Swiss-Prot record:
Catalysed reactions listed for this entry: 2 (2R)-3-phosphoglycerate + 2 H(+) = D-ribulose 1,5-bisphosphate + CO2 + H2O; D-ribulose 1,5-bisphosphate + O2 = 2-phosphoglycolate + (2R)-3-phosphoglycerate + 2 H(+)
Organism: Kigelia africana
Protein name: Ribulose bisphosphate carboxylase large chain
Amino-acid positions noted as binding Mg(2+) in the UniProt annotation, renumbered to this chain: K192, D194, E195
EC number: 4.1.1.39
């Protein structure tokens, strides 16, 4: 019949297309879908494709004014999740025309927007995205990347060492700067503002920036090494954030910091552009990520947030520790660590990687291991993360019984010992404790640290684990 046929029709009639062959320019998404009882997986998968692209709940007259075939998302493959009675991985392909160039904000508004509140689904989780090279080329990405950062810092062949200044809230700017100086003088490469530190009554941002810059230059002069402190530019408005970044540049410091999820992708991308134009490195903290990524059946996996950050821009990002106090299983963590650092990553379901991803010319991001780690973890961290990483010890530096500078010395000695042992061909996983003990014989600072933390472990099973093999 000619003309418009009003009414409601099943999504799967339009949006479930198992015969579809994906294009190189499509954005591909893997969703973990838990349909409501009685809703077939084809209908649920098609509903996800529809609601995150061109569809709405009823047919509309204006559908006839455009080519739905050109613009609609398509659910092209569904597979049951092994070991789960009512979960399916639904693969959806989106035509590239649906997205604004260079906008992570727009990409997420579509793909993880209203569809997550959809009644026909009990739960929905975005497991992975394949970003086509054509879309990647519309993003600047990280301001500098791994190689440029090493060249700026003149540090090669080892992981970098950091420390989050604690107590995270309550110090005056002067005392805060003192702690920064002691840690950097003791041998760390970086110190860090805690993510909660913005500009509170006890320490306004400008005072903190000044005292930290002074600490940094003093430590640089005494050690002959380039030092950095992540000055947190996160603020209540984009304008205020940029004002803080400009002041950091005027002070001549090497690096600023942003909380990219609470600050938002629009603000983050603006800041990343400023950092590239003005030679600032950009450290990214992922505060709020666990709200989005910790539940296994709903939300968004961190590997998607990591990909989005590489597009939006950042030179460092927190990526879990595998061995510390915060969530992160080894295979999954290494999966998205490689996604951050490498140019090309093959599909590998054993590490939770659903798609092959080619980053073309986008620089890499350095993963930061931080949270409940100390000197006994150093061999494992060196082995797991390799050279292109930042290992951050907050309490593991400042909790040293002799103070901050000896805490920094202990970490630097432990790191150098692990790197030396690895370069000599020793097995860090098997001999880690022995390597640390040997080094502590000639470093009293390390010996004291070893004594304090010899029994500390955070042994809980990860919540977000890989699915069993079929």
């Amino acid at each position: 019949s000619v003309g418009f046929k009003a009414g409601v029709k099943e999504y799967k009639l339009t949006y479930y297309t198992p015969e579809y062959e994906t294009k190189d320019t499509d954005i591909l998404a893997a969703f973990r879908v838990t349909p409501q009882p009685g809703v077939p997986p084809e209908e649920a998968g098609a509903a996800v494709a529809a609601e995150s692209s061109t569809g709405t709940w009823t047919t509309v007259w204006t559908d006839g004014l455009t080519s739905l075939d050109r613009y609609k998302g398509r659910c092209y493959h569904i597979e049951p999740v092994p070991g789960e009675a009512d979960q399916y991985i639904c693969y959806v392909a989106y035509p590239l025309d649906l997205f604004e160039e260079g906008s992570v904000t727009n990409m997420f508004t579509s793909i993880v927007g209203n569809v997550f509140g959809f009644k026909a689904l009990r739960a929905l989780r975005l497991e992975d995205l394949r970003i086509p090279t054509a879309y990647i080329k519309t993003f600047q990405g990280p301001p500098h990347g791994i190689q440029v950062e090493r060249d700026k810092l003149n540090k090669y062949g080892r992981p970098l060492l950091g420390c989050t200044i604690k107590p995270k809230l309550g110090l005056s700017a002067k005392n805060y700067g003192r702690a920064v100086y002691e840690c950097l003088r003791g041998g760390l490469d970086f110190t860090k503002d805690d993510e909660n530190v913005n500009s509170q009554p006890f320490m306004r941002w400008r005072d903190r920036f000044l005292f930290c810059a002074e600490a940094l230059y003093k430590a640089q002069a005494e050690t002959g090494e380039i030092k950095g402190h992540y000055l947190n530019a996160t603020a209540g408005t984009c304008e205020e954030m940029m004002k803080r970044a400009v002041f950091a540049r005027e002070l001549g410091v090497p690096i600023v910091m942003h909380d990219y999820l609470t600050g938002g992708f629009t603000a983050n991308t603006s800041l990343a552009h400023y950092c590239r134009d003005n030679g600032l490195l950009l450290h990214i903290h992922r505060a709020m990520h666990a709200v989005i990524d910790r539940q296994k059946n709903h939300g968004m996996h961190f590997r998607v947030l990591a990909k989005a950050l590489r597009m939006s821009g950042g030179d460092h990002i927190h990526a879990g520790t595998v061995v510390g106090k915060l969530e992160g299983e080894r295979d999954i963590t290494l999966g998205f660590v490689d996604l951050l650092r490498d140019d090309f990553i093959e599909k590998d379901r054993s590490r939770g990687i659903y798609f092959t991803q080619d980053w073309v010319s986008l620089p890499g991001v350095i993963p930061v291991a931080s949270g409940g780690i100390h000197v006994w973890h150093m061999p494992a961290l060196t082995e797991i993360f390799g050279d292109d990483s930042v290992l951050q010890f907050g309490g593991g530096t400042l909790g040293h019984p002799w103070g901050n500078a000896p805490g920094a010395v202990a970490n630097r000695v432990a790191l150098e010992a692990c790197v030396k042992a690895r370069n000599e061909g020793r097995d860090l996983a098997a001999e880690g404790n022995a390597i640390i003990r040997e080094a502590s014989k000639w470093s009293p600072q390390l010996a004291a640290a070893c004594e304090v933390w010899k029994e500390i472990k955070f042994e809980f099973k990860a919540v977000d684990t890989l699915d069993p093999e079929k």
